[in-house]
Amino acid sequence: MAQPGKPQSVLELSRLLNIPLDDCVVPCNFCKRFLSYTELTDFDTKCLSLIWKDDFVFACCRYCCVATAAFEFENYFVESVIGWEIEQKENTPLSDIIVRCHHCLKLLNQIEKLDICGRSELFHKVRRGWKGLCRQCKQI
């Protein structure tokens, strides 16, 4: 949940603080370990939002993203649909449907969503959002 006036990405945070991105020190909201430079850039690449608690900022490390995705999938799974059925289910064009990776939480781009449809793979409804596999996690 975005907080007005607070940076939502690591890049925005580094610009606000007027420091290089690799000087940003942000702890994980779950394990409290500081994210590495690679994890900070991955966090922004996944289009995740920083978590603000009062004036303290947190992110989510790679391991906790995977653990969170697995926990949510196991505990809040609603249903699965095959490929293009997602448009009928949502009554919305695929390009307007927000889908995150059910393994790493990355926001899927249009090509990744089309790939799932073209291969007749599954989209999964978890809580109120849709999940699919991103191209990186398909390789695992």
From Swiss-Prot:
Keyword Cell wall biogenesis/degradation included in the entry's annotation: no
Localization, UniProt: Host cytoplasm; Host nucleus
Any GO BP: symbiont-mediated suppression of host innate immune response
Gene Ontology cellular-component terms listed: host cell cytoplasm; host cell nucleus
Keywords attached to this entry: Activator, DNA-binding, Early protein, Host cytoplasm, Host nucleus, Host-virus interaction, Inhibition of host innate immune response by virus, Metal-binding, Modulation of host cell apoptosis by virus, Transcription, Transcription regulation, Viral immunoevasion, Zinc, Zinc-finger
GO terms, molecular function: DNA binding; zinc ion binding
InterPro entries: E6, E6_sf
Zinc finger (unnamed): 28-64, 101-137
Superkingdom field: Viruses
TM segment ranges: none
Role summary: Plays a major role in the induction and maintenance of cellular transformation. E6 associates with host UBE3A/E6-AP ubiquitin-protein ligase and modulates its activity. Protects host keratinocytes from apoptosis by mediating the degradation of host BAK1. May also inhibit host immune response.
Family (UniProt): Belongs to the papillomaviridae E6 protein family.
Binding partners and assembly: Forms homodimers. Interacts with ubiquitin-protein ligase UBE3A/E6-AP; this interaction stimulates UBE3A ubiquitin activity. Interacts with host BAK1.
Name of the protein described by the UniProt record: Protein E6
Species whose genome carries this gene: Human papillomavirus 24
